[in-house]
Design a protein with these regions (language model features):
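Glycine/Thr-rich beta-alpha phosphate-binding loop at enzyme active sites
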Residues: 129-180, 219, 224-226, 231
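Glycine-rich phosphate-binding active-site loops on the catalytic face of alpha/beta enzymes
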Residues: 41-47, 83-98, 157, 164-166, ...
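Active-site mouth loops of central-metabolism enzymes
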Residues: 11-26, 70-74, 125-147, 198-202
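Conserved N-terminal beta1-alpha1 strand-loop-helix module at the mouth
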Residues: 1-64, 140-161
Length: 253
């Protein structure tokens, strides 16, 4: 069975992302994990340490859903996750974020990688003001460039996930529409990629709109606001309504 099959990736519509560098009370973490989300993703950009990642993973040890780690640094290469999502920054201006860091890591720990749990994820880091964009030297793509990036990740590389990330705020609606349209065409031709979106999802309306355009929404920064648990409930309600009413996300036709 593939890594995607092991974690039921095809059924994910709502994912929460928790940052090891932004601690939450243990009870809050427990409530998030048991909320009904489809998966929990551990990941971040800044000040990651092995101890922080392990601490958060330990708090999620009883989660009833898959707990996955976004491997953005060697500190994230710890045992115990259900899957490891390896980011390929498709629009990076520095090739170390597309292949360089990956080769360095594989040279160090490649013999111990649990390949049955590894998925490559094509990231399109579209908000130039985000920490991830600054680190990866990623510029905001035009609509034409975005279409090419989706076609490259989904059509050429056949990645299981293409992730449109607009961390910190909402992406322009037209940008998400372009990504969804390109991915639908590739999937209709036999492609397998799923489209994730993360950025600015802070309540029912923003979640519901994105669920009409993409396969999976990722709720992250808003969980750390004073309304964090309320945001979680609202976005899950949007997911449930989308499932009940048949919102297509990225259908095959």
């Amino acid at each position: 069975m593939t890594a995607a099959g092991r974690i039921g990736l095809a059924g994910w519509r709502h994912v929460v992302k928790l940052d090891p560098d932004k601690p939450l009370p243990a009870e809050t973490v427990r409530r998030i994990a048991a909320s009904g989300t489809d998966a929990v993703l551990i990941g971040g950009t800044q000040r990651l340490t092995r101890a922080k990642v392990l601490r958060l993973l330990w708090r999620l040890r009883h989660a009833p859903v898959p707990v996955c780690i976004e491997v953005t640094a060697m500190a994230c290469a710890v045992p115990g996750a259900d899957a490891y999502l390896v980011p390929l920054a498709l629009n990076t201006g520095d090739l170390q974020w597309l292949s360089g860091r990956h080769l360095e890591g594989l040279a160090r720990v490649g013999a111990r990688v649990p390949w049955e749990r590894v998925l490559a994820v094509g990231y399109i880091i579209a908000n130039p003001h985000s920490a991830a964009a600054r680190r990866a030297q990623a510029a905001e793509p035009s609509e034409e460039e975005l279409a090419a990036l989706v076609r490259y990740g989904a059509g050429i590389l056949d990645l299981p996930v293409v992730y449109l990330e607009y961390s910190g705020s909402q992406a322009p609606d037209a940008m998400v529409e372009v990504a969804g349209r390109c991915l639908r065409r590739i999937r209709a031709a036999g492609g397998r990629s799923r489209l994730f979106y993360g950025g600015g999802i802070a309540g029912y309306e923003s979640a519901r709109r994105r669920l009409q355009q993409v396969d999976t929404i990722v709720v992250g920064n808003a969980l750390y606001s004073p309304r964090g648990l309320a945001v979680l409930e609202e976005t899950l309600a949007a997911r449930d309504d989308a499932l009940r009413e048949g919102d297509p996300g990225c259908p095959t036709s």
